[in-house]
Amino acid sequence: MLLFFALGLLIHFVFFASIFDIYFTSPLVHGMTPQFTPLPPPAKRLVLFVADGLRADTLYELDEDGNSRAPFIRNVIIHEGSWGVSHTRVPTESRPGHVALIAGFYEDVSAVAKGWKENPVEFDSLFNESKYTWSWGSPDILPMFAKGASGDHVYTYSYDAQREDFGAHDATKLDTWVFDKVKDFFDAARNNQSLFTKVNEEKVVFFLHLLGIDTNGHAHRPSSREYKDNIKKVDDGVKEIVSIFKHFYGDDGKTAFIFTSDHGMTDWGSHGAGHPSETLTPFVTWGAGIKFPQNVSAQQYDDEFLKEWRLENWKRRDVNQADIAPLMASLIGVPFPLNSVGILPVGYLNNTGLFKAESMFTNAVQILEQFKVKMTQKKEATLPFLFTPFKLLSDSQQLDILRKARSYIKQEKFDEVVSLCEELIDLALRGLSYYHTYDRLFLGINVAVGFVGWMSYTSLLIIKSHSNIPKGTRKEGKKPHCLLLYSFIATGVLVACFLMIQACPWTYYVYCLLPVPIWYAVLREHEVIQDLVESLLTFPRSHFVAYLLVFTLGIEVLVLSFFYRYMLTAGLIVFAGWPFLTQLWTRAKITFLSWAFFSLLLAVFPLMPVVGRKPNLSLVMGAGFLVLLLSLAVVTTLGKRNIKLVKGELLVLLLQMLSTVLSMYVVYSTHHSLLKKEGLPLMNQIVSWATLASSLVAPLLSSTALSQRLASILLSLMSTYLLLSTGYEALFPLVLSCLMFVWIQVEQETLQQPGVSCKQKLTSIQFTCDTDIAQFRQLCPDDIRRAFFLVFFLLTAFFGTGNIASINSFDLASVYCFLTVFSPFMMGALMMWKILIPFVLVMCAFEAVQITTQLSSKGLFLVVLIISDIMALHFFFLVKDSGSWLDIGTSISHYVIVMSMTIFLVFLNGLAQLLTTKKLQLCGKPKSHLM
């Protein structure tokens, strides 16, 4: 059986990894020829300001007094330059946002798993194409463009990462540091001939990354005074830097300025998803080569923003974020970034029709180059008779469009050139997408076939080893087995040869060959299949249909809960009424009334708001007091039942209660310290980490008696959970644990069925009891319900307090008791542990259910595995590659979550067994005893 689980884990890792090869492969290609506009550029230098985390509405709108928060930028919009909204794509994070701005392509999703701060995939950027680039700002952003540059012409100046502290007194210092360093730089340039020569060259870029607004947004929310004051500070800084440039270069009119943001921010201070507050960012540009403000009476945009911002009289020109890279390249005359998919927004250019036409033609050729390289790569890796080219853009069509465009330029039909080039770019981008997803259907079918085969084999294993289906007596010769084996070997060889001829990557061999041994294992069990068919034929058809409908409905409820959290509420309401429909409640009315009460109480949580809530310390404190009351109730109950606690175990229980009190104090103290902008107290940080470290050890010091050990696990994990809570979610594990304890009692009551031994008292059950394998019974239909309950409770633990499929459901304030300095991996790990704590509580309860129902954990686990795999197959087919970027990202994340859950179940099961069955001795004392 151990071999089966090891193979199962390996197979699920393959299925999990397949999504990265099918949907998460790098779209980048290499080997293109650089393309640049063959005319003198309007600017010699470009200054790029990126205000990290700045929302478009917060910058453009007027305050309560009717004044702008950024008067200099607003003056630019009205008197000097052009403006609009830059539309970002999901994920709205700093790295993909800057890659889109500076390199012109959207986040290479294959890089997500490889690194947060540096993009490990080689790509070209505006900085690489420039003669010199000087950049100032965050150490998280600048290095990835410097390391990706060829040569040493990209210079970076970063502050220490420790400055990125969400609990710091004043995050605007991050921005003033940048402005001060730029001023020092130009002071030094006046006295350094070598540097003076460099900054006076053409094709030079200055990049100012301003992180203060983002940091203040995370720490205080975008509606806060700190966030809005930071915008004013940035505006003042930009005004001063512009003045320095004009003074240094003698106001030569050869400097272009761009002010924008990498992403916005939600009202609750997070970003990453596709809410308009995250995807709508400001874009203001002025200076050399930029069109002056244009008064208009009507605009093409239907939204109400223009009236709210009182900018309806000034021409608004929206862009996609990747379009900014070709605009910057055009302004200073450098080659367009090789991997850019941005479309030059010619409406921003203040230049001749010829310059606009030539720039647009260059843009089209640059994107067409990528299409041609991608097509060549795919053609070379596919058998000629199997290759299907992109029909909308054949070689002859490419030549026709390019000749036509060049002819229009000679005839000075510049508007027609722009339209024709936009059409060519659209076709080339569609062609790029076509070749990028060329193998998707082929790989998808292979993975799906493997999935179905695995589920079939697992089902047959359950029927063979854990069911009462009668086995037929047949005598089979070895010949059919040999024939079957040789057939599958031949199939595998043919598949391998086919892949070898096409020079496919090694991962393709894994996805295409994996179904072969799986289906061989399925068809080898043809005797079990025959027994199953014969048994089903004797089973009442109406009962079979009813069971199938209930099972299908249950699976669909689980799947729908990923999209609609209220489906969990509906399920819990059904759970509450289940005992009353089956007459079970007449056996133990208090138990089943408790079951109904806690089911309905837990059903409230999925109806609560996912995010956007303000910190509510009173609810966290309330949860802490309830934990203390519960622990006192446990001690009292044990005393009433004459259960003696060993001195050491009583001490552990008291220390766990003290840990809960300390956690409450740390949460309260940290919250008020951050409000006063005094940062995270060191003692609070030490206590928090010590509590986290002890939470997995303390339960091992308690008694292994079922109720005592479960209470100890809850107390330990709740201390950590309180430290990671900011509001109502602190109550969630408490209510969930109460329901789990009642679930154990409910499952005991269901044992009063014919053929099942009488139940034991919970107080007499030990997690460490040596159960004879002969006592394990075979699976029955009720066990499928138990497995379904487990999966449902796991999903409730997952989505009960938020939709973690969306990255912006995370509130960074949750980790402020542990750290406030920006550290994505450490913060992510703490968030993950917060998510896993309810999981662990459910799995520990499931361990108890298995013991009380005398059921083999292997048999029940296999049923859970099948339910999870059916859900995973659902989401595999629901993955989208079209529609909004939010829909695409969400559909992929759902599949990843289910597959992760299936894989994690094995590890969580092991962790639950460790927490429930292992016992550490204190000073050589014996284990607790019952009286």
Curated annotation (Swiss-Prot):
Location(s) in or outside the cell: Endoplasmic reticulum membrane
Topology of this chain in the membrane: Multi-pass membrane protein
Pathway the protein acts in: Glycolipid biosynthesis; glycosylphosphatidylinositol-anchor biosynthesis
Pfam families: Phosphodiest, PigN
Keywords: Endoplasmic reticulum, Glycoprotein, GPI-anchor biosynthesis, Membrane, Transferase, Transmembrane, Transmembrane helix
Function per UniProt: Ethanolamine phosphate transferase that catalyzes an ethanolamine phosphate (EtNP) transfer from phosphatidylethanolamine (PE) to the 2-OH position of the first alpha-1,4-linked mannose of the alpha-D-Man-(1->6)-alpha-D-Man-(1->4)-alpha-D-GlcN-(1->6)-(1-radyl,2-acyl-sn-glycero-3-phospho)-2-acyl-inositol (also termed H3) intermediate to generate an alpha-D-Man-(1->6)-2-PEtn-alpha-D-Man-(1->4)-alpha-D-GlcN-(1->6)-(1-radyl,2-acyl-sn-glycero-3-phospho)-2-acyl-inositol and participates in the eighth step of the glycosylphosphatidylinositol-anchor biosynthesis.
Official protein name in the record: GPI ethanolamine phosphate transferase 1
Organism: Mus musculus
